[in-house]
Amino acid sequence: YEELRKIAAEMISEKTDISVEKVYDLFCNETGYQTPKVDTRAAVFMDDKILLVHENNGTWSLPGGWCDVDQSIASNTEKEVKEEAGFTVKAEKLIAVQDWRKHNVTNYAYGVVKAFVMCRYESGNFEENIETTEIAFFGKDEIPDHLAVEKCTREQIIMCFEAYEKPEMSTLFD
């Protein structure tokens, strides 16, 4: 098994540009086969515009993040919006479930499943925080260029607009 693990680490390293040693360390405590991490992204609309958060690295993204082990998809999405944008929202509809490798720019060693969730704004005000320097609402034709494409792409934001414009739209999935 040790030889197989070494070969797997080399393969992942080649595909992701992460050093073999780092990949090896990432999986040293794992037992069983690998399963994907879950990332949730919120689509919050106000006046027909979508909420994006401006991250401290200078890129824009839908609010969201890794799903904590004690959270559901809905509760994690609501929690992430509160942490990043200061808003209390209600998760109302699952827009899409996507395989990260098929839609996002990444060299991450793990598999990731992304859940996009339509959320209704309830209350709150933004305050700059450790992750977010500002927030803004953008129209479909106003989406900024500097997106955190490992988190959300222009196409994924447009997909959220389509779900907003067509509430009867079925959940999309890979």
Question: Model regions: which residues?
Answer:
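Unchanged
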Residues: 67-91, 99-156, 172-174
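Conserved positions in beta-strands of structured domains
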Residues: 45, 92-95
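Acidic/histidine-enriched, glycine/proline-rich intrinsically disordered or flexible terminal extensions
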Residues: 162-174
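Residue-level "edge-of-site" marker
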Residues: 56, 94-97
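Acidic, metal-coordinating catalytic segment for phosphate/diphosphate chemistry
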Residues: 2-41
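Glycine-rich active-site/cofactor-binding loop and its immediate structural neighborhood
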Residues: 29-78
